[in-house]
Amino acid sequence: MVYPVVEAESRVGFGKGFARRARAAGKIPAVAYGLKRAPEHVLLPAAQMSLIMRRANALLQLKIDARESLVLIKQVQRDRIRNIIEHLDMLFVNEDDAVTIRVPLRFVGQSYAGTVTSVENYSVAVTLQVSQIPEALVVDVSGLQAGRRIFASDIALPDGALLVSPPRLLIAKVDPVRRATQESPPD
């Protein structure tokens, strides 16, 4: 499988001041760890990473000092006001490793006429091989009638994937549309 390659610079400075200067220069401070390797503190190009981060559970080839390693973005710290990435935690992985991650759900279709679908959870936790991580799991609500509930156990998973979320975790429910009642005007 082909993954985007990101050139990373080894990071020598630490602390809030260094991180601010790095972000001002268009770099994102990050750390990669796992696979019984020493943590590697790096700087990543902000523009390239913001494009890669549009996908959930993004995998990429991290190129540090002429050696490439496959990494999974584990945690993203964002500045909510300026909507910028402040820091990334990444996990070194092999394609055949099994990882437990939260996979987003994509809802398709429309429920039966006269009903409304209420989404209770937008992701589920699953364990699967790194090479099989989907961008999203599809939940089809087409033609569901009032009173129907969709649980985590109802979601179709990729081959070899195991559901970690509780099987009875409510994902969505279909309820009848409530009609507005006309109230008599006050006297």
From Swiss-Prot:
Keywords: Ribonucleoprotein, Ribosomal protein, RNA-binding, rRNA-binding
Intrachain S-S bonds: none
Matching Pfam families: Ribosomal_L25p (PF01386), Ribosomal_TL5_C (PF14693)
GO molecular function terms listed in the Swiss-Prot or TrEMBL record: 5S rRNA binding; structural constituent of ribosome
Gene3D superfamilies: Ribosomal protein L25, beta domain (2.170.120.20), Ribosomal Protein L25, Chain P (2.40.240.10)
GO biological process, one term: translation
Record carries keyword Plastid: no
Task performed by this protein: This is one of the proteins that binds to the 5S RNA in the ribosome where it forms part of the central protuberance.
Subunit and interaction comment: Part of the 50S ribosomal subunit; part of the 5S rRNA/L5/L18/L25 subcomplex. Contacts the 5S rRNA. Binds to the 5S rRNA independently of L5 and L18.
HAMAP family: Ribosomal_bL25_CTC
Protein name as it appears in the record: Large ribosomal subunit protein bL25
Record organism: Tropheryma whipplei (strain Twist) (Whipple's bacillus)
Organismal lineage: Bacteria, Bacillati, Actinomycetota, Actinomycetes, Micrococcales
